Amino acid sequence: MKYRALVLSMLLVLPSSCGWQLRDTQLVPSAIGTLYLSSSDRNSALITELERALSINGIKVIADKAAADYSVIIVDYRQNSRTASINPSGRVAEYQLNEDVDFIIADAQGNEMIPLSTASVERVYEFNEDDILSSSNESRSVRDRMHEEIVRQILNRLRVFSDNATP
């Protein structure tokens, strides 16, 4: 019985000791308080994912910039796709997708706490010309995962900022 308890406790402790954590459990201290998101496209999938992740981390996103403790300003959002490889018949075999988000984190007075930074992600997916629907679904799924990665990069900057801001 003691052996089972020891093995069970080791299985619980080892993953956390190596830094492993579940996705979307990146801790951003709630000491950040309230946050205002500024973007030219408030209805984009990226902004929706960012709002969801902030909410999960206990940060309240508000619509009034003047009442917010901090602002995340999305300056530019770029999506790009290009042919990554071609098959022997000269048709597209893979596409490369790129997304870049330029952002600034500012305090309530508008002072830049984190100057212009870029979150970038690049992925390649196989394109099957015989099954356009499945290739389209694959592209959408890859884009969704890319949004999650960009959001993680922005949250990481917020976490580092909040760690450095607290004494």
For the regions a language model picked out, list residue spans one by one.
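Solvent-exposed, acidic/flexible segments
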Residues: N43, I47, E94-N98, S139-V151
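Short acidic low-complexity segments
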Residues: I59-Y70
